[in-house]
Each structure stands twice: as structure tokens, then as C-alpha cells.
Amino acid sequence: MLKKIIPAIVLIAGTSGVVNAGNWQYKSLDVNVNIEQNFIPDIDSAVRIIPVNYDSDPKLNSQLYTVEMTIPAGVSAVKIVPTDSLTSSGQQIGKLVNVNNPDQNMNYYIRKDSGAGKFMAGQKGSFSVKENTSYTFSAIYTGGEYPNSGYSSGTYAGHLTVSFYSN
């Protein structure tokens, strides 16, 4: 298990250059990404996990990675933004594709696992938080687009991206 401390995430300020961003502003959030497979972390205003060799027989609701976040002073709410847009109501954060069988797509969603209240995959990801409190999130596999009942083991490629915004 590889553990990497990720520097503070850069957050979009106000509405400058962002449509419908509301009053979300820059706040530093300490994020610790616990990577359970062979991945390369890359930070670009988001936590982006790029699979290198994910050899697996995927199981529903299996965790791909977890994110631990400590809330700094002055932050009372956090919003998780998936890859597609700032206004999406679902929290799909990406898709992995079997490199030998492109019909086998694994859809991943973010899930809040700890802290005050929980939300499950697909629910809106804006929630209240407490200062100096740690929260844990996980990327979970919730199904794919393969028409048959199972997925074959193999190498899956793609990327999962999630941004954390604070008020």
C-alpha cells in the first residue's frame, strides 16, 4: 500500500472564470491520498489518480482509493466536484476501460465515508463540515457498461479526478 501526502489543493476563487461557482473560495485543505494500487498521483487543482497497471477482477462497491481531508479553521462547508462540471448533481469521477476489451468500462463515484453525516455515490456532494475535523472519502466501483454479468480480469486504464472546494 502506497501512502503519499498531497499538498494543499488549489481552490477556485469566487466566480472568476468559473460559471455558477457561487461563493466558493480559495481555502487550503490538507489532503492525504491512500493509493491501494499502482497509481501515479498528479495535482492540478484536483486530485487526479492515473492508473498504470490495475490488474483486477472488479467487484461492486470495492474501494479503489481513499482520500483523507482535514478541515482548516474558517471552513464550514465543502463541495466535491466531479470531472464533468461544477454543477453536476451526481458524483461520478471517472471511468476505467479494459485495455483488451474496451466494452468493459468501470464507472467510479466518490463516497463520503466518515465525519458528520454521509453521502453515497451519485448524491450531491455539498456538505457541512467542522473545523479541525478529518473526513474520509473513497472512490468506489458502482457498475459499468458491460452488457454481461461479469468483468474479466485485466489491465484497466483511464483517470479519476475529483476537486474539493470550500466556502
Swiss-Prot record:
Location(s), subcellular: Fimbrium
Statement: the UniProt record of this protein carries the keyword Signal: yes
Signal peptide: 1-21
CC annotations in GO: pilus
Protein keywords: Fimbrium, Signal
Transmembrane regions listed in the UniProt entry: none
Protein name in UniProt: CS6 fimbrial subunit B
Organism expressing this protein natively: Escherichia coli
Gene coding for it: cssB
